Curated annotation (Swiss-Prot):
Residues 1-11, 644-656 have a biased composition (Polar residues). Its EC number is 3.4.16.6. The lineage of its organism: Eukaryota, Fungi, Dikarya, Basidiomycota, Pucciniomycotina. Keywords: Apoptosis, Carboxypeptidase, Glycoprotein, Golgi apparatus, Hydrolase, Membrane, Protease, Signal, Transmembrane, Transmembrane helix. Residues 1-79, 608-656 are annotated as: Disordered. GO terms for cellular component: membrane; trans-Golgi network. It is found in: Golgi apparatus, trans-Golgi network membrane. Its main location: Golgi. This is Pheromone-processing carboxypeptidase KEX1. GO terms for biological process: apoptotic process; proteolysis. The active site is at 228, 423, 481. It comes from the Eukaryota. The chain crosses the membrane at residues 560-580. InterPro entries: AB_hydrolase_fold, Peptidase_S10, Ser_caboxypep_his_AS.
């Protein structure tokens, strides 16, 4: 194992800490992945916090604390945001302390939230809480690179663009930075969180404060979602919400993408995945090294009755795999990207600096004007994607892996686990092993009734779908550790299916295209023709639609029905005009009957009206967004890293 791998094996899941200080464990640093921050990101600035209390001045000049209102957190716009954007955003700090307590601001700890309201009104109002992993990684990873409505324009000098297929198309998204010291969250030093039950209690307190300020969201279905090490956060938070009486929002389910949930089965799955996809030749010396590390791991497991969240004796397996991929290309050392094995990266990063969006996101979120717009100015230091000190202090020595909570949770709520098939760090084979060894609802693993069903989005293969007894597993095709980054329309379809949202009544981009699991009917909706361009064609994208069973109907049936409806409406309009003309003639208003040009104009206006969508009353920019063609490269865009020797270099192109 190289010295770099020894110091950074744990960076991956949590993302990017390439030179962490006194690493508590190798694997955490790979989960985290970010460069270390020596800045005081957990230290508040000298300004007065406006999160849990709002400061006002009375007539005597003395400052008085008042409870904040929703308007205090409103974000009219962000620097660089499109001028015609109709997003409704709120952001700011909320205390991690219990809602019925008051602590001096300089002694309190604060989480940061970023609320993106739903663009369309769905049949089921939903609030999604999103958490990124780490420990210590900001949820702006999810917001600005995966499921949020805004993206940075690469090398665009801080310019943002609005995207379709965001998860707030049909659900309200609440991104949270936690635990203390993560992203824009802050608190006095030292005040780091060490255990999962503490982090979940802090989140419950923050959510209780959020619902007090935004009470309308407490009536909505509540879901918690995230990825990577959030596979530990999310089940713990779900159980805490079910156990508490200070949050009345109905928790309906959780979603975890490429999650670190069951350490034992995840570690043991590494060799299987590496051999299966060809990262390591099973007959090579590299395979011997991998198997040596696997033996150390299994010996530790067999001799210990407890299961920590990270097992030191098992962390050499991943290092042996990544070390075996190091090659020299054009005088530069290269290795595979552990988050997307289709790609390569410069050694020893091996994916730690991926995706390339971070080069723009990091300076943007450190800008003073951006902090002010987000009401985050009380976080004094520059924004850091993943704070090393948070992860190094999150020991979790007494916390059991979150997989132990699954049987009880599955008795009460739905759980969706999704895995990008190109991820190594939290490979899908580990999630599948976990399910096979999990006992819930009276049975271990899947029963014979549960089968892998092919999942298609707009006619293209999107992955496999399997569900039974409140558990859904989705293997997402052509996707990395950050699946929504690679296939946004596909993962949006996954979301609306799991939430039970009827996009045909909510409109929006997902209503334009088709989605199908197994033998479901694939229904096309919003089949309209504008400027001779037919929307709803097969291509990259998705729809989460009201699902029925039966054969797929012929497209001609829909076209014939649409034509009949159109002719009927035109006939009604013409009949109405004829009736009005006769009535006016009878009443002596003959002038109307002698102006055929006016008559023609009325007919044309009504003819055009029948080609508009149900949302034609929306402002033009909103309508344009709904009728934009769906991108066709959603399923095969690999987002190659800029450090590759050439734009077409993948791991498979390296000499072996």
């Amino acid at each position: 194992m190289s010295s770099f791998q020894s110091a950074t094996t744990r960076q991956g899941l949590h993302r990017r800490n390439m030179n962490s200080e006194t690493p508590q464990s190798e694997f955490i640093q790979r989960l985290r992945r970010s460069p270390p921050s020596e800045s005081s990101s957990s230290t508040p600035s000298s300004s007065t916090t406006t999160s849990s209390t709002t400061t006002t001045s009375n007539t005597s000049g003395k400052k008085k604390k008042t409870a904040p209102s929703a308007s205090d957190f409103y974000v009219p716009s962000l620097p660089g945001q499109p001028k015609d954007s109709q997003l409704i955003l709120y952001a700011g700090h909320l205390s991690f302390s219990p809602p019925d307590t008051t602590i001096e601001p300089e002694k309190d700890s604060y989480g940061f939230f970023f609320l993106n309201k739903a663009r369309h009104i769905a049949n089921r109002p939903v609030l999604l809480v999103w958490l990124n992993g780490g420990p210590g990684c900001s949820s702006f990873d999810g917001s600005l690179m995966e499921v949020g409505p805004l993206r940075m324009v690469l090398k665009g000098d801080g310019t943002l663009k609005e995207v379709d297929a965001a998860w707030n198309e049909y659900a309200n998204m609440l991104f949270i930075d936690q635990p203390t010291g993560t992203g824009y969250s802050y608190g006095p030093k030292p005040n780091y969180v060490h255990e999962l039950d503490v982090s979940s209690a802090n989140l419950v307190n923050l959510l209780a404060r959020f619902f007090k300020i935004f009470p309308e969201y407490q009536q909505m279905d509540l879901y918690i979602c995230g990825e990577s090490f959030a596979g530990q956060y999310i089940p713990y938070l779900a159980q805490a919400i079910l156990d508490t009486n200070i949050i009345s929002a109905p928790l309906k389910g959780i979603m975890i993408g490429n999650g670190w949930i069951d350490p034992i089965n995840q570690y043991l799955a590494y060799p299987e995945f590496a051999f299966k996809v060809g990262l390591v030749n099973p007959s090579s010396k590299a395979a011997d090294l991998v198997n040596e590390e696997l033996k150390k791991c299994t010996e530790w497991i067999d001799s210990n009755s407890t299961t920590p969240i990270h097992i030191e004796a098992c962390e050499g397996i991943l290092s042996a795999i990544t070390d075996s991929t190091v090659q020299t290309v054009n005088s530069q050392k290269m290795c595979l990207n552990m988050y997307d094995v289709r790609l390569v990266d410069s050694y020893p990063a091996c994916g730690l600096t991926w995706p390339p969006d971070l080069a723009d996101i990091t300076p943007y979120l450190s800008r003073t004007d951006v902090k002010q717009a987000l009401h985050a100015q009380d976080h004094a230091a520059d924004w850091v994607e993943c704070e090393a000190k948070v992860g190094n202090n999150f020991w979790a020595k007494t916390s059991q892996p979150s997989v132990t909570l699954f049987p009880k949770l599955l008795d009460k709520i739905k759980i969706l686990l999704f895995s990008g098939d190109q991820d190594l760090i939290c490979c899908h084979t580990g999630t599948e092993r976990m399910i096979d060894h999990l006992t819930w609802a009276g049975h271990q693993g899947w029963t014979s009734q549960a089968i892998n069903q092919p999942w298609k989005v707009n006619g293209s293969y999107a992955g496999l779908w399997k569900e039974e007894r409140n558990l859904t597993y989705v293997l997402v095709a052509n996707a990395s550790h950050m699946a929504p980054y690679d296939v946004p329309y596909v993962t949006q379809d996954m979301l609306v299916r799991f939430l039970g949202i009827d996009v045909m009544t909510a409109a929006g981009p997902a209503a334009q295209i088709t989605s199908r699991i197994g033998e479901e009917t694939a229904t096309k909706v919003n089949r309209v023709v504008m400027n001779e361009t037919k929307l709803g064609q097969e291509g990259s994208g998705t729809t989460g639609l009201a699902m029925t069973s039966g054969p797929v109907h012929d497209e001609n049936y829909y076209n014939a029905s649409s034509a009949m409806l159109f002719l009927t409406l035109v006939g009604l309009v013409v009949g109405l005009i004829f009736f009005v003309r006769r009535r006016l003639r009878r009443d002596g208003h003959g002038d109307f009957a002698h102006h055929p040009s006016d008559e023609t104009e009325i007919i044309l206006k009504n003819h055009h009206h029948h080609h508009l969508s149900p949302d034609s009353s929306l402002p033009r920019s909103a309508r344009d967004r709904q009728f934009q063609p769906v991108p066709t490269d959603d399923l095969d865009d690999h987002h190659l890293h800029p450090n590759l020797p050439s734009n077409n270099t993948s791991y498979q192109d390296l000499p072996r």
